[in-house]
Amino acid sequence: VWLIQWAKSRSEQNPFGVPIPNFAQVTKTIYRGALPDEAGYRGLIEKVGVVRVCSIIEHEVRADKERALAAGITEWRHIAFSDRDAPAPARVREWLAYIRTSDTQGALFTHCRGGRHRTGTLIAVYRVADCGWTKEQAFGEMMKYGWYDALGHRPLRDWFFHEFDPKDYEQKN
């Protein structure tokens, strides 16, 4: 089943024509997906006006930062998350604080390697904490973009359903 989910998510096209797997618009200024190549970064800038990137890959990938900045991304940020362990609440809050600036600081794109597990979990957190979605609705979106529990990813889902409390991540005005 997980292999089918993965293959399906890799093959779907997005309406923006941005050549990035699992690419989608979250809000008018927040986008999500997999690790872009050069064409992906150009597409982000040219097709949807992204100017900032937040990489959530566990270890900073210098080549990714260089690729993004060379393509014209004006700000690249790294906040490390594991794709096998429950996220640290402080890191989740840091990520939320950063993406919540997209309306005032410029459109942004957040990504992990495949745009499924870390990205899916954090976008689900955002959907529940800021958009009023239920956890079930947010998990449905995770599934749409290729979520699967196999290969050690189950702790992320367990954290989301059993430990994540949206009240702990509310936006402070």
Model-derived features: positions:
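Cys-dependent protein tyrosine phosphatase-like superfamily
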Residues: 1-108, 121-173
